[in-house]
Regions:
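Conserved functional hotspots at enzyme active or ligand-binding sites that engage polyanionic ligands
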Residues: 1-161
């Protein structure tokens, strides 16, 4: 298999990055890496995931330019306990098996909670998804964010101004 997948994914080995689970080299993180991250506690509480949990890196702002702050874009995960909501919407909630990228339990990727976090919130590297494991996450985000060109507002002369 080629080290670069159809969605631009490259394994850590292909990038020359060691696979140490110790403190991650935040400079070397890339889409498809699974990290342990500390998500902020929200006051007042909402529906967002919070606390210490695994997350999949899905975006590196430095690919577009120099960001104001050192952040990464991630999809938080939760433990798969056979929740019906995830079974009803598998494209929105891709599942990963126990052991995938060193996950301790079967997990659900919460695409509806994609967000930026400060790089200092990344507390450890767990592993890297292969292209087949990352594909449902990539495709789901692409469709959800209308990256395929669907649902993009047409420019009118009023809005062009």
């Amino acid at each position: 298999m080629s080290p670069t997948g159809a969605c631009g994914w490259r394994s850590r080995a292909a990038r020359g990055v060691p696979s140490s689970p110790d403190a991650p080299d935040k400079e070397a993180l890339a889409a498809g890496d699974v990290v342990s991250a500390l998500f902020p506690i929200h006051v007042p509480g909402g529906r967002e995931q919070q606390g210490f949990r695994p997350a999949v890196v899905v975006g590196i702002p430095e690919r577009l330019g120099v960001p104001r702050f050192e952040v990464i874009v991630v999809v938080p995960m939760t433990t798969d306990r056979g929740q019906q909501w995830s079974e009803r919407s598998p494209a929105l909630y891709p599942h990963l098996e126990k052991g995938t990228a060193n996950l301790r339990s079967p997990s659900i990727c919460l695409l509806d909670q994609v967000r930026s976090i400060g790089a200092e919130r990344v507390r450890g590297y767990r592993g890297t998804l292969d292209a087949e494991q990352y594909r449902p996450i990539h495709d789901g985000l692409r469709k959800m964010m209308s990256y395929d060109g669907e649902d993009v507002p047409e420019q009118t002369t009023e809005s062009a101004g």
